[in-house]
Curated annotation (Swiss-Prot):
GO biological process per UniProt: ribosome biogenesis
Family: Belongs to the TRAFAC class TrmE-Era-EngA-EngB-Septin-like GTPase superfamily. EngA (Der) GTPase family.
Name of encoding gene: der
Record domain KH-like: where: 352-436
Domain EngA-type G: 4-167, 175-351
Keyword Ribonucleoprotein part of the UniProt annotation: no
Native species: Lactococcus lactis subsp. lactis (strain IL1403)
This protein's name: GTPase Der
Length: 436
C-alpha cells in the first residue's frame, strides 16, 4: 500500500529544511532514508501515532536558473500536485513578505489540507505576533521553533489528523508496475508498445488523490496489470518538469506505489548516477526489479556487445545481481513480447512462500557445505528458520547469538536459498534473531 505524502513549502530561509530534519530526525522514527540522496535529502519516510507517511522538502528542488518568485511558485505547484497534506512555512521573525503571500495565493487553489507553520518563535513574547499570519488565509498558525524542537509535536498531530483514511489492501492478484528512467530513455515509447500489442485496455482511472493516470489492462491469459503513471505532469510543460531532483521525486513516488519496477536504461548512453540512485531506492524498498535496456537496435554489435553491456550493469548495479536483464527496442519491437511474462515471473517470485520444513532442509544443507563461523572460540548455532513475509520474501533465522551472524554468512545463506528456489527479480531478506 502506498503511503500518503506531506510536502513542505515556503520561501527560502524560513527554515523548511530544519523543520524537515526535525520531523524526520527526532520526533518520528525514520523508517527509511533514500540511498544516495544524503547530500540533498528531499524525501524521507516516517511514522507518528502509528501512521506512516512520506515527507518531501520542496526547497530541495532547486530551479536555480529561474527568477526567485517563479521558483517558489513552482515549488508550491509541486506540493499541490504531489502531496496529500501541505505544510506552509513562514518566518516569525521577519513577518509576512510578498513571497509568503505569493505562496498563499497559489495554495488557495488546492482542496488539500494546508497546515500553516510559523517558524523561529523562540520565546513566549513572539507567540503574540503569530496572529498577524491569520491574514494569509491559511487557517490557524502553529508556532514552532524548529531549531529547539518546540511545537513540533503539535504539527505532527495536525499532519496525522489530516492524512487521508487508510484504504484496504488492493487485490493481490493485480500486478502493479512502473517504468522508471532518465528522460529520453524511451519510457513513453515502451509504454505505447506494451499497451499496443494485443492488450485490452480495461479502464484508465484517475490516481487516488493526485492527477496521475494509471492504466489497467489484461493480457491473453487474463492476468490484470496496472501500469503506474510516472509522467504525472504531462499537461504542464512547466519549468520544473526536467529538473533532476523533481524527476527523482516523481520516480520515488511511482516506485512506492509499484510492486515491480522496470528500470529503463538507454543503450546509447549507458548507466548514469541517476539510474544508480533510483535503482538503489527500488532495491531498498524491496520492490521487484527488471532491468530493461532500450534502444538496443541503435548499437553496432559484435559477439561481445551484450556480454560487455551486462558486465557494466552487473558492475555498477552490484546490489541488483538478482535482477534479470532484457535488451529491447521500442522502435522495432525487439523482445517486447517478453516483458509481460517476465513481469509475471517476478510477481510469482515475490509472492512465493516456502514451508518451514523445506526451508530448514536447505539451511541445514548449507551449513553442511559451509560450517557456521566462530568468534573468540564461540560458534554460531542455527536452530531453525521460517518465512515471515512476502513482497519481498523475508526469512528469520533463529540463532544462539545474533552478533555471531556475520553479514557474509547471511549472504551465503541467501545464495543457497536462491539456488534452491526461484527468486529471480526480487530481493530476499534474511534476518538473524536470537532464540528466546
Amino acid at each position: 500500500m502506498s503511503l500518503p505524502t506531506v510536502a513542505i513549502v515556503g520561501r527560502p530561509n524560513v527554515g523548511k529544511s530544519t523543520i524537515f530534519n526535525r520531523i524526520a530526525g527526532e520526533r518520528i522514527s525514520i523508517v527509511e532514508d533514500i540511498p544516495g540522496v544524503t547530500r540533498d535529502r528531499i524525501y524521507a519516510t516516517g511514522e507518528w501515532l502509528t501512521r506512516k507517511f512520506n515527507i518531501i522538502d520542496t526547497g530541495g528542488i532547486e530551479l536555480s536558473d529561474e527568477p526567485f518568485m517563479t521558483e517558489i511558485r513552482a515549488q508550491a505547484e509541486i506540493a499541490m500536485t504531489e502531496a496529500d497534506v501541505i505544510i506552509a512555512v513562514v518566518d516569525g521573525e521577519t513577518g509576512i513578505t510578498d513571497a509568503d503571500e505569493a505562496v498563499a495565493n497559489i495554495l488557495y487553489r488546492t482542496d488539500k489540507p494546508v497546515i500553516l507553520v510559523v517558524n523561529k518563535v523562540d520565546n513566549p513574547e513572539r507567540r503574540m505576533e503569530i496572529f498577524d499570519f491569520y491574514s494569509l488565509g491559511l487557517g490557524d498558525p502553529y508556532p514552532v521553533s524548529a531549531v529547539h524542537g518546540i511545537g513540533t509535536g503539535d504539527v505532527l498531530d495536525a499532519i496525522v489528523q489530516n492524512l487521508p483514511n487508510e484504504i484496504e489492501e488492493e487485490n493481490e492478484n493485480v500486478i502493479k508496475f512502473s517504468l522508471i528512467g532518465r528522460p529520453n530513455v524511451g519510457k513513453s515509447s515502451l509504454i505505447n508498445a506494451i499497451l499496443g500489442e494485443d492488450r485490452v485496455i480495461a479502464s484508465p482511472i484517475a490516481g487516488t488523490t493526485r492527477d496521475a493516470i494509471d492504466t489497467h489492462f489484461v493480457d491473453s491469459e487474463d492476468q490484470e496489470f496496472v501500469m503506474i503513471d510516472t509522467a504525472g505532469m504531462r499537461k504542464s510543460g512547466k519549468i520544473y518538469e526536467n529538473t533532476e531532483k523533481y524527476s527523482v521525486m516523481r520516480a520515488m513516488r511511482a516506485i512506492d506505489r509499484s510492486d515491480i519496477v522496470l528500470m529503463v536504461i538507454n543503450a546509447e548512453e549507458g548507466i548514469r548516477e541517476y539510474d544508480m540512485r533510483i535503482a538503489g531506492f527500488a532495491h531498498e524498498a524491496g520492490k521487484g526489479i527488471l532491468i530493461v535496456v532500450n534502444k538496443w537496435d541503435t548499437l553496432e554489435k559484435d559477439n561481445d556487445t551484450m556480454k560487455n553491456f551486462e558486465l557494466e550493469i552487473r558492475t555498477k548495479f552490484k546490489f541488483l545481481d538478482y535482477a534479470p536483464i532484457v535488451y529491447v527496442s521500442a522502435k522495432t519491437g525487439q523482445r517486447l513480447n517478453k516483458l509481460p511474462d517476465m513481469i509475471k515471473e517476478i510477481h510469482h517470485a515475490q509472492n512465493l512462500r516456502i514451508s518451514s520444513s523445506v526451508l530448514n532442509d536447505v539451511i541445514m544443507d548449507a551449513v553442511a557445505i559451509n560450517p557456521t563461523p566462530t568468534d573468540k572460540g564461540k560458534r554460531l548455532k542455527i536452530f531453525y528458520a521460517t518465512q515471515v513475509a512476502i513482497k519481498p520474501p523475508t526469512f528469520v533465522v533463529f540463532v544462539n547469538e545474533e552478533e555471531l551472524m556475520h553479514f557474509s554468512y547471511l549472504r551465503f545463506l541467501e545464495n543457497q536459498i536462491r539456488k534452491a528456489f526461484v527468486f529471480e527479480g526480487t530481493p530476499v531478506h534474511l534476518i538473524a534473531r536470537k532464540r528466546k
